[in-house]
Structures are given as C-alpha cells and as structure tokens.
Design a protein with these regions (language model features):
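C-terminal motif of bacterial Sec signal peptides marking the signal peptidase cleavage site
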Residues: 24-25
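Glycan-processing catalytic domains of CAZymes
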Residues: 29-231
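Bacterial N-terminal signal peptides that target proteins for export
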Residues: 3-13
Length: 231
C-alpha cells in the first residue's frame, strides 16, 4: 500500500522559507531563487514523464529509482528533495513494522501511523540506512516530516534523537527542509548554532482539514498569525 497521507489531497498551504530572520545561520537555503515549488508526496514513478520545468520538486523517492531521478533532471527539474518520515512509523512501509516496540503512542487521525522513539539507536540506524539509499538515488535534499514528535513527547532524549538524525543527513552534503516541527525548530534556533536546517515548510497556515466532518476550514486569525510569525 502506498502512502495515503498525500499533501495535495489535503490542500495544504506550502510555504518555503528562506527568511534570514528565521534561518539566519544557514548558508544557501533550498533553491534560493525557486519560483516553481511542487510537492507531490503520494505519487510514484508513473508521473516522471508528466513533470518538467520545476525549480524544486518534493517526492517520496522511495517509490522512484535512480534512473527515474535522472530522468526528472533531464525533464528540467532543477532540485529534487525526498520526503522522509523520521518521527513516526507507517504500517505500509515494510521496515517500519520491525520497530513496533519503540512506538510511543497513536498518531491522531492517522491510524496507519504511530509516534516513534527517535532516541532508539535501532531507529536511528534504520533512518541512516534510508538516508543512504536516497542519497544513492541522487536526491538533492530531504523534506523531513514528523519532528513534531518532540511536541507530543517533549523530552530531551527525543530532541537529541532528532538532532542525531539531522546531523547524519547533514553529513551527506544534502540540504534539509523541516516540514512543520515548530516546537522543535524554535528550540533548535534558540539553543543551537544553526548548521542543519536550510528551510521550513509549514502546512495549514491559512486552512485546515476537519477530519470529523471531512471538510476544509479557514483558520482563525490567531492561528494564521502564529504560523506566519513562526515562518
């Protein structure tokens, strides 16, 4: 089963952040001059020939081969980031079922996911292996999901576990974009010298999905202001 948490389906507001105020310690952020930014998580290699002339594309490269990535570049995709989930396990990914004993709790509204203890060395090793595989495929960066595990489980071991994983990614020479993760990112930027994060993507800035009614809603002013201030 493919990943069903598809960003386009939920009509997320996607905000690519290259702000010096937020990421002042970064060198070069994701596609500093990117005008066409496309997120296609949930798609597979069947879309390869349908895409062209994109500055920054986010895909789940687990479903793409090295040749697919090369073909995307031939089609004019200038930067390619891969989705990677570091903070939860997903039942449709075969390797994640091996880590059930490290789960922390249910992931609200996503029954196929559970929060994972990112401080577990076994999980960190698994994530490193996934990172290596994505690097071999030729991606330019990582679109890192579920650092929000620190919001749900605000323990130093969880925070440090995220740092360990991001540090491994950073040493590959690829760029790192955090999806959401405001609680983690705010702490990181106030307590560390930023050498890891190149950008932030935030969902649900202006709208949100109401799971109970299966509909979309407009965020209230305070929510909009919180996210825009964060970004």
């Amino acid at each position: 089963m493919k990943k069903t948490k598809i960003f386009l389906r939920k009509i997320y507001v996607l905000v690519l952040i290259l702000s010096a105020a937020l990421l002042s310690a970064c060198s070069a952020g994701p596609s500093d001059e990117a005008e066409k930014y496309v997120v296609l998580i949930g798609e597979d290699s069947e879309i390869t020939e349908k895409l062209s002339d994109i500055d920054l594309l986010v895909i789940d490269a687990e479903y793409f081969s090295q040749n697919d990535i090369a073909r995307l570049r031939e089609n004019g995709i200038r930067e390619i980031y891969s989705y990677i989930n570091i903070g939860s396990i997903e039942s449709f990914r075969s390797y994640d079922t091996d880590f059930e004993k490290y789960t922390l709790g249910a992931y609200e509204n996503w029954p196929e996911e559970k929060w994972i203890d990112v401080s577990a060395p076994e999980w960190q090793a698994c994530t490193a292996s996934r990172v290596d595989a994505l690097v071999q495929k030729g991606v330019d960066g990582f679109f890192v999901d579920n650092t929000d595990v620190y919001y749900n489980y605000p323990q130093e071991s969880i925070y440090d576990g995220i740092l360990t994983i991001l540090d491994y990614m950073d040493h590959t020479g690829r760029k790192i974009m955090i999806n959401g993760g405001d609680c983690f990112v705010k702490k990181y930027l106030t307590t560390e010298k930023n050498v890891l994060i190149d950008g932030v993507n935030q969902e649900n800035v202006f709208t949100a999905y109401d799971f109970s009614n299966d509909t979309y809603t407009i965020n209230d002013k305070s929510t909009r202001e919180y996210y825009t201030d964060y970004l």
